Curated annotation (Swiss-Prot):
Family per similarity comment: Belongs to the cationic peptide 04 (cupiennin) family. 09 subfamily.
Species for this entry: Cupiennius salei (American wandering spider)
Record-given protein name: Cupiennin-6d
Tissue expression as described in the entry: Expressed by the venom gland.
GO cellular component, one term: extracellular region
């Protein structure tokens, strides 16, 4: 469960970064 959350956060951060561009 924790692992999944970490993965989601990573993906979210990556997506956020792309949106910022």
């Amino acid at each position: 469960f924790i692992n999944t959350i970490k993965l989601l956060i990573e993906k979210y951060r990556e997506w956020k970064n792309k949106q910022s561009s």
